[in-house]
Amino acid sequence: MTVTVTPIDLGFDRCYVLQGDGVIVIDGGAPKKGAAFRRGLERAGVRPQDVKLIVLTHGHWDHIGSAGEIKAITGAPLALHEREVSWLEQSLTPLPPGVTPYGRMFIKIHGWFMPLIKVPAAKVDMPLGDEDVLLTDYGIPGRIVYTPGHSSGSVSVLLDSGEAFVGDLAMNKVPLRLSPGLPIFAESPPAVIRSWESLLERGATTIYPAHGNPFSADVMRRAIEDLSRTPTSVWLQERT
């Protein structure tokens, strides 16, 4: 089965509309982006009522901000890992720590503006666990897989054809990164690496980040190989 992928920019990041025998949406963008989402659906030739599931890769504000609006537009249920359900249902806006010096500076500055950001609360209909969730019932040949690291409840969508929609497990957009690679923010850098090892072992070939354009999984494979030669790297050390 061929799956058509349509990105829709919702602020600084994007959501993805996947069309197979059914339609799902991945991520909910920044707040107040419902109109942009509706326009994107129209460009993709998708009727709102055709969307059967909204998968949120994690609970940070720029991925859940318009989740409630998208749910209202489509009538589709929201899926989010159980560890982060409260973030959406209680309008919480935690930020992950920076991994690199630049990441730490970026997140510090970002934090100054967080009091201005309001995430509308929305009910999560499908709390996800750590086990895979097949998407065949929604007409998509693939699965939701647990890929913690950027946050403790991060998930990815991995299609049988190798396309991986990873949220912020990778980044490919200025000013976050100049080129595709590992995220500059993460709750657990070693967990990020383990999640990448799992995705690559399971056949990921093309990576679709929430920030930036898709790129080859070989980029991540080389990044992990390089880190394996630097055992003192922060990416391999748990925070204390």
Functional labels for PLM-detected ranges:
Residues 1-44, 156-172:
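Conserved beta-strand hairpin/beta-sheet module of binuclear metal-dependent hydrolase folds
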Residues 215-240:
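Binuclear metal-ion centers of metallo-dependent hydrolases, dominated by the metallo-beta-lactamase
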Residues 30-31, 83-86, 170-171, 232:
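Short, acidic/turn-prone active-site loops that include or flank metal/cofactor-
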Residues 31-32, 118-125, 132, 141-218:
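Metallo-beta-lactamase
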Residues 42-127, 233:
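Active-site HxH/HxHxD metal-binding segment of metal-dependent hydrolases
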Residues 37-40, 66, 195, 223:
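A general structural detector for well-ordered alpha-helical segments in enzyme core domains, enriched
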Residues 24-26, 55, 78, 163-165, ...:
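Residue-level marker for buried hydrophobic side chains located in beta-strands
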Residues 8, 18, 132-138:
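Short acidic-hydrophobic surface loop/beta-edge motif
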